[in-house]
Amino acid sequence: MKDSIINKLESLSERHEELQALLGDPSVINDQDKFRAYSKEYSQLEEVVTTFNRWKKLNSDIEEAQILLDDPDMKEMAAEEIAENKAEIENLEQHLQILLLPKDPNDEYNAFLEIRAGTGGDEAGIFAGDLYRMYSRYCESKRWRIEEMSANESEQGGYKEIIVKISGEGVYGQLKFESGGHRVQRVPKTESQGRIHTSACTVAVMPELPESEMPEINPTDLRIDTYRSSGAGGQHVNTTDSAVRITHIPTGIVVECQDERSQHKNKAKALAVLASRIVQVEQERQAAEQADTRRNLLGSGDRSDKIRTYNYPQGRVTDHRINLTVYRLDEVMNGKIDELIQPIITEYQADQLAALSEQA
């Protein structure tokens, strides 16, 4: 392992010890804001320090075992121990490099998940409902909480658009690679000839920003319209103008919310989503500027950015970004999507490591 990496790990170990002492300091214990901040930093360093300590111990054990190589009675056992330790050290070094990769500060945040029906008419709306069910099941398995922000139901079932907030540990970091175009190939229930149709939905995942990080939005840049909440088919389900539509004039971003009976609550929810969308648009612009030399696995949420195909006749799901295909469509649609999410995260980390190597 490079000296620069070892030096970085040593400094993190020192910081870990320093934090341990601070967390036992009465003045810190009595200051809840400081205590929370130090506790969070301490827990974030825990894995890297534990792994580094293991790495150091194995290297020390190898040095001791090498002395025994001169002893005929111990030579075979020592050689075996050295080989085992070297294999583990190799794995630990790779893991440590991943742990040292720059962290996306948004990864620990809650997230807004937006699913919009695209091409395909009613079938696209039904597929949007299927995707929402898939993500809901996944969230249940992670014990994350889902709160509906806005839903525009489709007449044949499913949704024209649905936005939910997902709360839990590391939600955005786990789901951010789901952004992009999702395509389905299947025979619709309404298809009498048995022909396979292709429909599409767009998924966008945005971090829920804390108030301190929300962009300043000039009230004069907003157009706020109110109207009566409506269900599938357009029928009104409320007698007051509680639904809210907010347009951010400079960017053209439009957010609607009609989930709550209170206009005030709908407005607050819509503003929270709007703030995240504005930040996302700016981040996408910056990413596009940097994407000339390196591929971007983070989907843009653009309809043309096709990331995944769900093929029902063949029972397969294909992720086009890394050419991954799994033949467990039923399990995937029931929320077992870790086998799609984790390979993308691993590939992203590999790209980051490659970029760091080029800079070194």
Swiss-Prot record:
This is Peptide chain release factor 1. The keyword Transmembrane does not apply. It is found in: Cytoplasm. Residues 285-309 are annotated as: Disordered. Keywords: Cytoplasm, Methylation, Protein biosynthesis. InterPro entries: PCRF (IPR005139), Pep_chain_release_fac_I (IPR000352), Pep_chain_release_fac_I_sf (IPR045853), Prokaryotic/Mito_RF (IPR050057), RF-1 (IPR004373). Peptide chain release factor 1 directs the termination of translation in response to the peptide chain termination codons UAG and UAA. GO terms for molecular function: translation release factor activity, codon specific. Belongs to the prokaryotic/mitochondrial release factor family. Methylated by PrmC. Methylation increases the termination efficiency of RF1. The keyword Zinc does not apply. SUPFAM superfamilies: Release factor. GO terms for cellular component: cytoplasm. Residues 285-295 have a biased composition (Basic and acidic residues). Its main location: cytoplasm. NCBIfam families: prfA, PRK00591.1.
